[in-house]
Amino acid sequence: MSDDVTPIRQQYLEIKRQYPDTLLLFRLGDFYETFDQDAEIASRELDLVLTSRPIGNGLRAPLAGIPYHAIENYLARLIDKGYHVAICEQIGDQPAKGIFPRKVVRVVTPGTILEAGLLPVNSNNYLASIILQEGRAGIAYVDISTGEFAVTELDAPAGSSPASLNQDFGPIRAELTRLRPAEIIYPDNLVLPDGIPGHITAWPAWRFEPGKCQETLLSHFGVSSLEGFGLQGKSLAIRAAGGILQYIKETEEAALPLLSGLRLYSLSEFMTLDAATRRNLELTETLRGELRGSLLGVLDQTVTPMGKRNIRQWVSQPLLELDRIRKRQDGVEYFVSHSMPRAELRAALKPLSDLERLTNRILSGHAQPRDLVAMRETLTNLPKVQQSTKGSQAGEEELLPTSTFLPIFDSCSDELNMLQSSIDDDPPATLQNTGVIRPGFSPELDGVIQASSHAREWINNLEPAERQRTGIKTLKVGYNKVFGYYIEISQGQAANAPSEYIRKQTLVNAERYITPEMKEYETLVLNAEERIREIELRLFREVCSELMKSARRLLDTARALAELDVLSALAEAAALGSFIRPMVCEDNGLDIRDGRHPVVEQMLHGERYVPNDITFEEGEAIRIITGPNMSGKSTYLRQAALITLMAQMGSFVPATSATIGMVDRIFTRIGAQDEIHAGQSTFMVEMIEVANILHHATSRSLLILDEIGRGTSTYDGVSIAWAVVEYIHNHPQLRAKTLFATHYHELTQLADFLPGVRNYNVAVTEADGNVVFLHKIIPGGADRSYGIHVAQLAGLPRPVIQRAAEIMSELEKSSGQAVRINPQSAQQVALFPETNPLIDELEKLDMNSLSPIEALNILFEWQRHFLDKKK
């Protein structure tokens, strides 16, 4: 390395070489500086001024800086754009000679965020890893802000080849769509399937080597075998979990203690919902990305951050275990039938902070004084939460048998007592300022503070005392960082300075002095400030260390509070929406009476919603539903799926009664708007989704099929739709419960020879030429589509409506034969009046600039134009 390069430049280059793929924030005093290409990126992405800094040998390097106190705001913008940011800090004290030692203390990536201000409040911030090998996959995910760590293995779809998996592995896409990870890491020698969501980070393949990953897991958990985690023989799960731990060690090592457990889960524990179904049913967000209008938007009545994350998971993962479903229902039912305890519980939960993330910030060493204040206030409210679940405040005679279906939790009284005695009521935001520790907690700290206070008081009284003693009215006591405290006397009275004053500085208009006694008190004050800061930092860390010992109890309490919040929230939603408890059972039936769409009903704002039954009778497998657009077919289909899903997540449902046979998967084929931009036609997208359904549905699945075959010609569409219905009906391992909405009236003939098919239609009434949609599903096929009426409601121009009616009349007369439209009626219909070019010319004329002769010439041309048209 050249001797001409400055020491700071040398240090920077050495550190940057270790983190070449990151944007390096290099601490220099009160700023984080970026250099070279990093500076150009920071300037562009953060709207920073791009300057330069000398680097030796007459050269300068691009430079852009961020104030250290504002780093969180800038960091958020960089992470949101997918950058990995290495934070390099000054370590220890500056040596007498040379520069500060510096090191990278963490690398912040989209999946390794711990800053409260950067984390999504109502959802998890997952980091995921993927391994693919020989038709199988391993997925691990972790949220370092909550300590959640889980892993699974996925089987390939039946009939898939390893080559095809790298192009389209549906189960991976479905699981990652559920998780919505902020970042995904994978071996850099792997080709990922298309459509994987989130920021993607390729990592060296050797990091995922089986032996290395197993050793990483054994070392992290301090065990000699992974059998206790259920990972024996699951090499892909081990590689995914071990790889993600190594990534966290490289980026945010302080987060490793947060990961105290690893949960192996199977997709067979939960209802399968592929990406298309989650999107079509708008479970957690609408097609526009909004919460309002989604199922979660209706059900999420939670009042704590932990509860909001938890209810999102419940909506995203309906259960397949009957006992767990019924236990959740029992909790919801208690709060539905006990409205006063529900209200008291929700009031007690509302002030709570995010205990789960607060605990993990303490464990990671990122906690600040106000985090402990938030924890103290949360723990203070726990007795109220416990009391509200007993019903005694509401005058209930019975005590809630919490051990049966409600989570129980510790009041954490020891932790609360420690926080109450140690942390000040209103501490500073950061540990860089004093005032963190409550007076009386530490005799040592109190003594230093008292001595400092006495010294400050002496210095504060020095000016009036010396003025009176010396008689010098211009005498002042001041302070600066160069000389410390000093006595200043104007030049006119400097000759009267006492002999014990020691001259320190001469100014144009004044002399400055010090005294030995003043310097002693100055030393007491200045040393005391640093001493107080050191003692408070040590005590704060000791308090955090004690809380770390209680981390498991605190986290268990946080998760119990989250579950209580969700149960009471579902009860609140049930009360607001007049939901009932469904009967979930192991058979294959579906009987919903007076079912309603939970979202559409809420959007009606008090208007009457027309309920419908969804009852599959003995031997019935497929309902073919015909009827006009805008009549409610799609709403009917979706409400069947949503009611089933709500029942299996443990919620009450919008109906007067409901018996739900356990459904293993819900599939939907509704629309193709999201994939057209990827280069696939609407019809191709439709056929791919139908193929996926037919390959993976089982006899316990629920299929929602809307307008199969509409993306091609009528004959092709009818043929494909017909064949799909036959396949579902006749396949010995399929015959799934199916709701099939269609405009192809020919499909109603299937009920004549397929015993499991039934026809239904949407009731319509006509009066005085007007059509009224009754939104009621009734037996039988529809006799007309009423499409022209829908077009009229949509506001098409009257000439189009009239012309469509004429053509419809001709088509109906043809009785299915080739139609010859009357030439006279086939003339082009003018939808809008044609604009006369002379009018356009008149509008453009500038009358103020025309001469009389020019105006006469224009009139002559117009006259000739009209005369020519008459000929």
Q: What is each model feature region?
A:
Residues 1-334, 343, 350, 354-363, ...:
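Charged catalytic and DNA/RNA-contacting regions of genome-maintenance
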Residues 5-9, 25, 32, 36, ...:
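Amphipathic alpha-helical transducer elements in NTP-driven molecular machines
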Residues 8, 460, 467-491:
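Extended, charged helical/alpha-beta scaffold domains that provide interaction surfaces
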Residues 36-37, 234, 303, 312-314, ...:
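ATPase nucleotide-binding head domains, primarily ABC-like/P-loop NTPase cores
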Residues 88, 112-119, 255, 392-401, ...:
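Active-site phosphate-binding and catalytic loops of NTP-dependent enzymes
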Residues 364, 368, 378-381, 400, ...:
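Charged, surface-exposed helical/loop "interaction arms" that form contiguous linear patches used
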Residues 480, 843-871:
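Terminal-proximal interaction/regulatory segments of ATP-powered molecular machines
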Residues 507, 511-545:
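Extended, charged coiled-coil "arm/hinge" scaffolds of SMC/Rad50-like chromosome-maintenance ATPases
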